[in-house]
């Protein structure tokens, strides 16, 4: 058995009163002769850990020791030594790891951001192998439905994909998450992970065209979403020439600029384009001039300087950055 942490406090029998523990002498915690600020542990916690130290130092690989680790984890799920000893017990006793996985899921229900739990679950999944894939993906999906930015869940999910498989439906899953919340930067990050790492999609170059179309549509719907703009830029990683020459990127910027609202990232993207060999055409110049007149800033013959000046006004949080960008322009030097 994997042990049960779901014991009602009123029903718990102290270890010292349990017949099966009568032969064990608990080992108290040694804080030294004169502890300055000793921790005021509860009586239950102190007793469980005293007995745990006894079986741990005795290297007792027994069923009762396994049950004791469950109690200790129920009191402190972050104790690395307890989890480590539990793994030794599981292997020695040849415990059914499907049962252990259920135990971990119960513990995680109230401690989902505890690193030790995820480390242990990964160990269990690794032991079970590919058969654990679906349950692990479903487990992370359950966690992410409550907390879409849960770091440990995303990290575990990526580990499962890379080690146990399951790539086939992952891009669709990312699309589902983005359909629910287009601002979910974790879903954008996972989408990029999938198109660049999946062995079934062909890599970034093979996916670029369709992903650009997907991202352009997302940006048009919510141009104020920084995540989608960053994703678009990431689709041209190490391909800056392709990026600045892609007609879809420039036409997207122009379309957003003409709306005169939520154009911050379109404008910063245009600055990146204009800083390259590409010079904005008349349509872009007209759109920038309209924005300049809208916010009443000084006219400049160089469009890149004008863009920086506009960004200084519409993006005050990063005003120092835009001032620096302007100072780096050849025309401002």
Curated annotation (Swiss-Prot):
What is a GO molecular function of this protein?
Answer: protein geranylgeranyltransferase activity
Which keywords has UniProt assigned to this entry? Magnesium, Prenyltransferase, Repeat, Transferase
The protein's Enzyme Commission number: 2.5.1.58, 2.5.1.59
Q: Which GO terms describe its biological process?
A: protein farnesylation; protein geranylgeranylation
From the UniProt record, list the PFTA repeat ranges: 61-95, 96-130, 132-166, 167-200, 207-241
Signal sequence region: none
Please give the SUPFAM superfamilies that the UniProt record associates with this protein: Protein prenylyltransferase
Q: Which GO terms describe its cellular component?
A: CAAX-protein geranylgeranyltransferase complex; protein farnesyltransferase complex
**What are its cofactors?**
Mg(2+)
Which reactions appear under catalytic activity for this entry?
A: L-cysteinyl-[protein] + (2E,6E)-farnesyl diphosphate = S-(2E,6E)-farnesyl-L-cysteinyl-[protein] + diphosphate; geranylgeranyl diphosphate + L-cysteinyl-[protein] = S-geranylgeranyl-L-cysteinyl-[protein] + diphosphate
PANTHER family from the UniProt entry:
PROTEIN FARNESYLTRANSFERASE ALPHA SUBUNIT/RAB GERANYLGERANYL TRANSFERASE ALPHA SUBUNIT, PROTEIN FARNESYLTRANSFERASE_GERANYLGERANYLTRANSFERASE TYPE-1 SUBUNIT ALPHA
How it assembles, according to the record, is:
Heterodimer of FTA and FTB (farnesyltransferase). Heterodimer of an alpha and a beta subunit.
- Which family does the similarity line name? Belongs to the protein prenyltransferase subunit alpha family.
Q: What does this protein do?
A: Essential subunit of both the farnesyltransferase and the geranylgeranyltransferase complex. Contributes to the transfer of a farnesyl or geranylgeranyl moiety from farnesyl or geranylgeranyl diphosphate to a cysteine at the fourth position from the C-terminus of several proteins having the C-terminal sequence Cys-aliphatic-aliphatic-X.
In Swiss-Prot or TrEMBL terms, this protein is called Protein farnesyltransferase/geranylgeranyltransferase type-1 subunit alpha
Q: Which gene encodes it?
A: FTA
